[in-house]
């Protein structure tokens, strides 16, 4: 009865402790699941935001590519128009040169003819009066043709002015785009500063988490949480670095595009200058054409005078002189308008000089901005390199700490197994002591019984001392990872008390058996040896008994059944935790592969 009560008293605190441990484990697992779910949601939201940012950046790039294509088309069209204009002007120049050469020859002939006519007397004036209207009509037609040409040139001048206005508008748009890019660069700098602050916060949280132990959670779970946090921080740093590199490349490409556009604008300005020079040349050519018209008039008069007789030439000499004088007056009036054209040309030249000065100042400003951006890029690369080095050092330190903790866990598991083996031995020894009746106990060989008892007691003492030493070492080192260390000490004390009670029972039995030694004959030692062979003692390597106990001891059976159920639950919990950890690792690998593919697509 005393042994049964002692067994019930021994199993009840163990059951309570195990139930408390199971409840704590369930609470910890539920808390861990909630934390993981929150982290996964936060990661999903971040991924969605990053995807949206990538889509926005892609749309911006597409828009900029379309703008570049439109600008290229405009440049091609302008080049084609300029080529066509130059070809037309060259053809007109060649035709005007040919006409000028003809007019010079005719003028020389007219001059010689007039010199001859001055020597000859004037006669037959009425015949020439009939031919004068015909000559005047021809001259009027030629004047109208030249006026039409002057109108066309005026229209071309208006077109060139509109083209200059459009170029000014394009320059304004380019300046606005440069300002927008500066604002974007400032926003990127603010984002970088925010990320640096986040990194500093994470770096300050890491030693705090390492130094402050949480009594409600296990050390392995805390270490896994810290490792996952560091991995996420390293991934965010790598992603931010790649983003910054891509954005810097985009900015450099856009700056190159703007430099090309500036060069194209310079080429357009040079073309406008050449067009203005060609316009000056055209004005000069117009003046030459007017002179040529005058010479043609003189030539026509020579031809008509040559066809007629000398008398008719003498009579028509006076009116033919009056008409060229009138034409000369008209030409002088046209020459008076020439200073106005020169003033307009001077104004256009001054405007072009102002545009060139403004363009040069903008180029210098853009160069200064490019140099500033390059310096900022170098500084950012240096900071990123330092952050990566710090992250690598932290990863190494965490790996070393994890290895040390895994070794300590392995040692502690071995000590737990040994403690369980000793506890099962103690329970089976109690069962054996209760199973032996006083009559049978007196009939056994006393010497064999004492030897087996002493060997079992010595073994239990040795195992208990070894377990105590292991627990003392773990307590001194201060690196235990389980929160229920006090339970091990209590179980050790309980085992020691049970051992003392077993010794007291054996001493009492020995005192009872001493007066009956002389009366009872010694029996052969086969009975006790058979009993020893069937006894459920546990070896040093096994955790559970080799043979089940007798049905007459329900307390030992209940304890064994309870231990088996607890082991099954522990194994199931381990399996669940391992499966959950594997799922998390697969998910992280999937996300990493996804982002690596996105990075590769960006680089392509």
Swiss-Prot record:
Q: Which UniProt keywords apply?
A: Cilium biogenesis/degradation, Coiled coil, Cytoplasm, Phosphoprotein
Family, as annotated: Belongs to the CEP63 family.
> Subunit comment for this entry?
Interacts with CEP152; the interaction is mutually exclusive with CEP63.
Query: Which source organism?
Result: Homo sapiens (Human)
* Pfam families the UniProt entry points to: CEP63 (PF17045)
Coiled coil regions in record: 14-59, 85-197, 226-278, 336-399, 558-601
The name of this protein is Deuterosome assembly protein 1
Gene Ontology molecular function: identical protein binding
Q: Which gene encodes it?
A: DEUP1
Q: Report the domain of life of the source organism.
A: Eukaryota
Write down any Gene Ontology CC term: centriole
Location relative to the cell? Cytoplasm
Entry function: Key structural component of the deuterosome, a structure that promotes de novo centriole amplification in multiciliated cells. Deuterosome-mediated centriole amplification occurs in terminally differentiated multiciliated cells and can generate more than 100 centrioles. Probably sufficient for the specification and formation of the deuterosome inner core. Interacts with CEP152 and recruits PLK4 to activate centriole biogenesis.
Q: Name one GO biological process term.
A: multi-ciliated epithelial cell differentiation
Q: Which PANTHER family does the record associate with it? A: DEUTEROSOME ASSEMBLY PROTEIN 1, SARCOMA ANTIGEN NY-SAR-24/CYTOSKELETAL PROTEIN SOJO
Further details from the record: CEP63 and DEUP1 paralogs are both involved in centriole amplification: while CEP63 mediates mother-centriole-dependent centriole duplication, DEUP1 mediates de novo centriole amplification in multiciliated cells.
Positions carrying Phosphoserine? 547
